[in-house]
From Swiss-Prot:
The protein's name: Eukaryotic translation initiation factor 3 subunit G
GO BP annotations, alphabetical order: formation of cytoplasmic translation initiation complex; translation reinitiation; translational termination
RRM domain sequence ranges: 209-287
Record's function text: RNA-binding component of the eukaryotic translation initiation factor 3 (eIF-3) complex, which is involved in protein synthesis of a specialized repertoire of mRNAs and, together with other initiation factors, stimulates binding of mRNA and methionyl-tRNAi to the 40S ribosome. The eIF-3 complex specifically targets and initiates translation of a subset of mRNAs involved in cell proliferation. This subunit can bind 18S rRNA.
Localization annotation: Cytoplasm
Residues of the signal peptide: none
Pfam family, one: RRM_1
Stretch list, region Disordered: 1-33
CDD domains in alphabetical order: eIF3G, RRM_eIF3G_like
SMART domains listed in its UniProt record: RRM
Organism: Emericella nidulans (strain FGSC A4 / ATCC 38163 / CBS 112.46 / NRRL 194 / M139)
Quaternary structure (record): Component of the eukaryotic translation initiation factor 3 (eIF-3) complex.
Amino acid sequence: MSRPTKADWADDEEFDDPSALPPQQITTNKDGTKTVVSYRFNDEGKKVKVTRRIKTTVVREHVNPQVAERRTWAKFGLEKGHAAGPSFDTTSVGENIVFRPSVNWKAQAAEAEKNGGEKGSIKDQLKDKKVKCRICSGEHFTARCPFKDTMAPVDEPGAGGAEGGAAAGEDAAGGLGAGGGSYVPPHLRKGAAGGGERMAGKYEKDDLATLRVTNVSELAEEQELRDLFERFGRVTRVFLARDRETQRAKGFAFISFADRSDAARACDKMDGFGYRHLILRVEFAKRAT
């Protein structure tokens, strides 16, 4: 009489592994779409059911017959045996750029080559250039000048010079009082009568062509916003508010155009535009009072 063999636990078909996931289910719907039901574990280790609805769209593209034939060739050389299509480690797929030369592109190319030979490259031209402030002539950008709110640019009327220095000396001396030595506020000193006009004149930021964009993604970049709005006209300034600690966007930005008509067209087209899974709200910026 033969001895009965001991059953192996791996042969038990009814064994249920609590960590195993149910198989993926694919259902074809009447409208041609497919419903894919799959399971996965989330970060907390819980089993999560994921339902996706997939619609297949066939896009017909007319290509050159010779190009279509070359795509059917088997790969050779170092790529022999690899799957069809471009390989990401050897091929870089870029954007298809449509080149439209101008009518007189030959003359422009010849002129650019001639000017480049005479003046040298742009790098050589800017090699000895230094940043110079238009307000105080210091070696910093004009926007970062500490005197931009109190001084006019050097090439504007009222800027500091030989005569301006003398006048400044008189104002500085008179700033402490007409003669009694008492303190006089800056807006009551000599030459400050037109302060209000100066603030409301050419030195005030022109908000007539500035758009306020809200509901901006915190992952947005200034260059991306510039590319989005430059389709409607020349953009002079892009300001994206960021958090000081995280350097992420706060959710709003200001876009300034050179022409108000371009700003109006951009406001009409971009209001309600989807950007980074959010709907942008675009309106004209209100003038600060």
